[in-house]
Amino acid sequence: MTTHVVLYSGGLDSTIVLDMVRRTLARMGDEVVPVYFDLRQPYSEAEIRRLDPSIQIDDRISWLGEADETSPIPIVSLRNIFMVLLCATMGNKVYFGQLHPLSESTSDGDQLFLSLMSLLLQKVASDPRHGLAYPEVFTPLSEYSKPQAVRRYLASGGRPEALLSSFSCFQPLDDTPCGECNACVNRYVALKLNSLPPGTEYIVNPESTQYYDFEFKRQATTL
């Protein structure tokens, strides 16, 4: 039996990856384990409140520290490394929702990162005393932009309702997304380019923000 471990945040990308693993990648008898890592960020409580009971919550790396608030996309340094390593102790196939570099350019999610992490894990697994079953790391969305990933998900029979209930916001007010941050705008644009409503109320209309026009034009070129 193969255990598929999915890094899950509740956003569009991880929602699509989890559905992809459950419907097309996992075989009969395989186990699929979605894991949410609580990094104790300002948005973490809002994300956790929306999680389905089937999602496993893990707080073992909550000590990593605060994100860089000066960046448009708050980044917790080294989080992907630690999350992948921990996931590899739970199963032998690990997935996370990294997009094409056109959409998200990052040094801890590209193909070189994946290759190095897989090599490291397989080196450790070569010693049977560690009890690891040759873990592999996958990013099934790495060839697609966010709107492309949404379009492929819908074309494959994915439920629009799952996308509309997704949540991505760095500065929510209680459970209401701000509408102004990069995460809100990217989610809004990806749904709009696929003729879907946002599925939520925003504090600020994303179309009135400084990011909207740029992101809409940039993401539209990928379709």
Report the location of each language-model feature.
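ATP/NTP-dependent adenylation/nucleotidyl-transfer catalytic domains that generate, transfer
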Residues: 2-6, 58-64, 71-75, 133, ...
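ATP-dependent adenylation/nucleotidyltransferase module used to activate substrates
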Residues: 1-159, 184
